[in-house]
């Protein structure tokens, strides 16, 4: 997980696109959940995860939720243990994981703290408004630390921890210099950003020691400096920099070191969903090639938002879309990010098992992640990487958007 640069984000969320005033919102809230898919033979044995929901944690400013997410990142780095979720879609993926040999035990925040706080070497102090979460998460990963606000740090049992860093007065320029000076400690195969929810994706970033960029408008020069510290053709997980506008956000990355975007802003427990202990299930290739008819124009309906892992985790798994009982009646095409195969393994496995025979998957925009090929700095290498990922998922085609 830490060395494969072809991983694209995986995460759970809702993406709001502001380009041209367009906004996508979830639909089908009243749909009944679809039946559970048939159980597969267990792929792992005796993995007992601790389950805790977002509603059971935190207060109005989410300081406890941020702390727990940072602790989960440290703990899940070596083996999957803490599954933090918000219910709804996550319960579905828990069901999928149970079929692979996982069990879940509910525990409270205090119980989890007593079990795992000793895994942290100390804490990183963040401002009470959580505006510097991106700096704190960057440092917490390499310092093996949890993230605490001033209020939490003054309370037991957290006050027994050593303060390893205080980022309340730091900015993104300071962070860029820190990453450059300590580059060997970071995993520079990816960068993370979250413009809307400071507690989400924290576990994933800390578990993998990924750096973060700002959760506000970034300075172009500083962001460019951060992007060129990464390995070429690395993913940017999240959404929202530098201008919180789709074209500028995506285009800026692909123009600078081939950084491609894997959208998703509300993801929790990605360190669990991408666990190496979960094995991807790949749909066997069709043994028969269907010959094309001559004199016929082929067309298909393509369901989009397949690049947005928020939708892949939740909306597309409802009865409204690919799991609808009548989806098999006509040929349909579904955009599917091949990065799910390693970043959100239960989600990938569900899509692979539940594709109707009349339907097909194509790689999402534009391949491994969201990029504009005509602006992509290392586009040839990017598509070579994408081609391998598509083959792993049994796909022959991808959607190109420029």
Feature-to-residue mapping (PLM):
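Catalytic domains of cell-wall/extracellular-matrix polysaccharide-remodeling enzymes
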Residues: 225, 235-251, 378-402
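C-terminal regions of proteins
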Residues: 364-379
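Terminal accessory/targeting
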Residues: 14, 32-341
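Well-ordered, non-membrane alpha-helical segments in soluble/globular domains
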Residues: 219-220, 311-323, 343-351, 376-389
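Intrinsically disordered, low-complexity repeat/linker tracts enriched for polar/charged residues
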Residues: 18-23, 27-29
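Single conserved hydrophobic/aromatic residue that forms the stacking wall/gate
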Residues: 1-16
């Amino acid at each position: 997980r830490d060395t494969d640069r072809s991983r694209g984000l995986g995460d759970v969320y809702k993406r709001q696109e502001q380009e041209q005033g367009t906004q996508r919102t979830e639909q089908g809230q009243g749909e009944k959940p679809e039946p559970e898919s048939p159980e597969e033979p267990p792929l792992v044995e005796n993995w007992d995860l601790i389950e805790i929901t977002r509603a059971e944690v935190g207060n109005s400013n989410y300081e406890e939720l941020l702390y727990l997410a940072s602790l989960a990142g440290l703990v899940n780095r070596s083996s999957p243990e803490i599954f933090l979720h918000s219910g709804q879609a996550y319960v579905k993926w828990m069901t999928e994981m149970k079929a692979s040999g996982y069990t879940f035990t509910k525990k409270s925040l205090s119980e989890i703290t007593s079990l795992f706080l000793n895994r942290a070497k100390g804490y990183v102090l963040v401002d009470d408004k959580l505006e510097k979460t991106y700096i704190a998460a960057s440092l917490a990963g390499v310092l093996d630390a949890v993230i605490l606000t001033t209020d939490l740090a003054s309370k037991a049992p957290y006050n027994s921890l050593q303060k390893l860093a205080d980022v309340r007065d730091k900015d993104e320029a300071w962070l860029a210099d820190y990453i450059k000076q300590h580059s060997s400690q970071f995993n520079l195969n990816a960068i993370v950003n979250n413009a809307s929810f400071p507690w989400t994706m924290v576990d994933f970033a800390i578990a993998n020691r990924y750096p973060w960029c700002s959760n506000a408008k970034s300075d172009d020069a500083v962001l460019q400096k951060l992007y060129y510290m990464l390995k070429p053709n690395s993913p940017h997980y999240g959404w929202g920099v530098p201008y919180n506008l789709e074209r500028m956000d995506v285009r800026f990355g692909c123009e600078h070191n081939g950084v491609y975007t894997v959208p998703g802003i509300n993801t929790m427990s990605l360190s669990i969903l991408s666990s190496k202990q979960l094995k991807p299930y790949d749909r066997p290739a069709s043994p028969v090639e269907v010959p094309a008819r001559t004199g016929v124009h082929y067309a298909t309906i393509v369901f989009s938002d397949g690049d947005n892992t928020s939708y892949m985790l939740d909306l597309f798994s409802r009865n409204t879309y690919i799991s609808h009982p009548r989806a098999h009646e006509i040929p349909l095409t579904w955009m599917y990010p091949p990065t799910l195969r390693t970043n959100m393994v239960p989600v990938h496995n569900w899509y692979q098992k539940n594709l109707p025979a009349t339907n097909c998957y194509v790689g999402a925009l534009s391949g491994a992640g969201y990029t504009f090929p005509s602006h992509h700095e290392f586009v040839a290498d990017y598509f070579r990487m994408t081609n391998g990922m598509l083959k792993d998922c049994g796909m022959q085609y991808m959607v190109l958007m420029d």
